[in-house]
Each structure stands twice: as structure tokens, then as C-alpha cells.
A protein has these predicted regions:
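Conserved structural core of kinase catalytic domains
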Residues: 1-23
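Conserved C-lobe activation region of Hanks-type protein kinase-like domains
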Residues: 91-155
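Terminal C-lobe "cap" of eukaryotic-type protein kinase domains
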Residues: 169-193
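Catalytic-loop of the protein kinase fold
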Residues: 39-57
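Regulatory extensions appended to serine/threonine kinase catalytic cores
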Residues: 191-209
């Protein structure tokens, strides 16, 4: 039996808490990628990557959930019957890439949200269903015709912009290399922003107490 996590899913938490330090959100990003790397190392594709399927524990760590559509040992040209909400969906133009593409692209959206506090090509975290499909169409257009996916703020782009772009362009075959690069980028950002990080430590300590 799984424990009841009173803090709920990460999407709802982000909407209801607007003062979460960036270092805290980055810590959650690393933990999410660690979870996905654990799945990929065991030939499991999550298939349904989005922030409502990330739960916040009582001590403010994150865990992945909802593996009802997960696939074990998928053949290379596997056709997925379902997936995450439209704004997280991997564009059809990437069909023929590794089946892990659905996780990698969705993870790119998750990372973008945690770093930007908004969804790609939208002003906040609460797009309408119509807007989600507009963004999906834009992602599909970029995949087929070229162009630029949405980008991070100037302060974070030098550290994490390439990682997010590689997710959107399916340059990772699995989450293990992504995890290594994200941890290295986080370490570099941490060294350059020590004062911000001290505030994040206080934030998490206060929440856990």
C-alpha cells in the first residue's frame, strides 16, 4: 500500500505557492530526472510524464507516480496508445526516434516549468485546453519545419538552456546522460549563486519543520 502524501502533486503545489526559490525547484528537477533514469535503466518507459504525476513527499522531496501506461522493453517503433496532457506530448514528427522520446520531451516541458514558472509558449501555469493544443501544434511545426522552442530566462539559459533544448530536440537517448549534465549544470549554478541557495536551504528547512 502506498502512503498518502498530504502535499499532493507538484503541479498543484506550484500553482498555490508562488514563492518557491529557484534552488528548491532545481533540486526537484534533479530528483525527477533521477527517478526517470531509474526507470530507463530498467527498460521502462514512463509514458505519462507531467507535473500532476509527480508527488511531493512530507519532507519535500519528489517522487514519480502513475505507471498505468508505462511500457517495459518497448520495441523501437512502438506506437503509444496514450500519453500526457497535450502540452507535454512529444510531437509526431519525432516518430522513428527512440521510444524513450515521449519521456524525454515531456521531461523537457517539466524542466522548463520548474525553471520558468510557466509552461512553454504561455504566460503562466494555467493554459486552457485550447491553448494546450495550440502549443502542441507549435511544437509539431517546429519539429517538422525547424525553428526555436521556447527558451529560458537570460539568467538561467547559460546554465540550463542547452539541456532543455536537447530534451525538446530529442538529443538524449535516455535520462542517464541528461541526469549527469543537469547535476553538473546545477553545481555550476550553485557555485555562482551562493546567496540565493542559502535562502532556498532556509525555505526547505522551514517547510520540513
Amino acid at each position: 500500500m502506498l502512503p498518502l502524501l498530504q502535499n499532493g502533486d507538484l503541479y498543484s503545489y506550484l500553482i498555490s505557492h508562488t514563492n518557491i526559490p529557484i534552488a528548491t525547484r532545481l533540486t526537484w528537477a534533479v530528483e525527477i530526472v533521477q527517478g526517470l533514469a531509474h526507470l530507463h535503466a530498467r527498460d521502462v518507459i514512463w509514458t505519462d510524464p507531467h507535473l500532476c504525476n509527480v508527488l511531493l513527499t512530507d519532507d519535500y522531496h519528489v517522487v514519480l507516480c502513475d505507471f498505468g501506461m508505462s511500457i517495459y522493453n518497448a520495441p523501437y517503433y512502438y506506437k503509444f496508445a496514450g500519453g500526457p496532457p497535450a502540452i507535454y506530448l512529444c510531437p509526431l514528427g519525432y516518430y522513428g526516434e527512440s521510444p524513450r522520446r515521449v519521456d524525454i520531451f515531456g521531461l523537457g516541458v517539466i524542466l522548463f516549468v520548474l525553471l520558468s514558472e510557466r509552461l512553454p509558449f504561455h504566460k503562466d501555469l494555467k493554459p486552457s485546453v485550447h491553448k494546450q493544443f495550440e502549443v502542441l501544434q507549435e511544437h509539431h511545426r517546429i519539429c517538422l519545419n525547424g525553428g526555436s522552442f521556447d527558451t529560458l530566462s537570460p539568467s538561467l539559459h547559460p546554465y540550463f538552456g542547452e539541456i532543455v533544448a536537447k530534451c525538446f530536440n530529442i538529443k538524449y537517448q535516455s535520462a542517464d546522460v541528461l541526469l549527469t549534465e543537469l547535476q553538473a549544470a546545477f553545481s555550476k549554478w550553485w557555485e555562482d549563486n551562493i546567496e540565493v541557495n542559502n535562502f532556498s536551504t532556509l525555505y526547505l528547512s522551514a517547510r520540513r519543520d
